[in-house]
Amino acid sequence: MGSLNVSIVTPDGPVYEGVAQMVIARTKAGELGILPGHVPLVAPLKIDIVRLKVESGEEWVAVNGGFMEVNGEEVNILADTAEREQDIDIDRAEKAKQRAEEELSRAKEQKVDEVLAQLALQRAINRIHAKEHN
């Protein structure tokens, strides 16, 4: 089986650069599994985990929106924000989740921007999921 050159980049810089046998990502149209030789595509990403099947097992990256470009043997992910599993501070993520839940509750009561509160909650849950997947 061949391999893919994978790059995950945010406005703050690169988060992951390496080789993977498969990339699994959730797009707005559903989950995609990318193998070497995949047809070229560009797809918007949902707030979710990008799973990288690598020689040593699997790496998880919490990606908060963005786009995935597949071209030949390359997968480039341009994410709004992204964190590798080992870089996530679980205490900070849990506190962010709690703040987002409180903000969502307040938003529903006060009819303020519920969408932003829901996005903050999704991002916090995504980070926690990436950190605790094992």
From Swiss-Prot:
Q: Offer an example of a GO molecular function term for this protein.
A: ATP binding
Topology within the bilayer: Peripheral membrane protein
Q: Where is it located?
A: Cell membrane
The record's annotation in NCBIfam families points to: ATP_synt_epsi, PRK00571.1-3, PRK13442.1
- Name the protein family: Belongs to the ATPase epsilon chain family.
Under which name does UniProt file this protein?
ATP synthase epsilon chain
Organism field: Listeria monocytogenes serotype 4a (strain HCC23)
Protein encoded by which gene: atpC
Q: What does this protein do?
A: Produces ATP from ADP in the presence of a proton gradient across the membrane.
Alphabetically ordered keywords of this record? ATP synthesis, Cell membrane, CF(1), Hydrogen ion transport, Ion transport, Membrane, Transport
**Gene3D superfamilies xrefs:** ATP synthase delta/epsilon subunit, C-terminal domain, F0F1 ATP synthase delta/epsilon subunit, N-terminal
Entry-linked PANTHER family: ATP SYNTHASE DELTA/EPSILON CHAIN (PTHR13822), ATP SYNTHASE EPSILON CHAIN, CHLOROPLASTIC (PTHR13822:SF10)
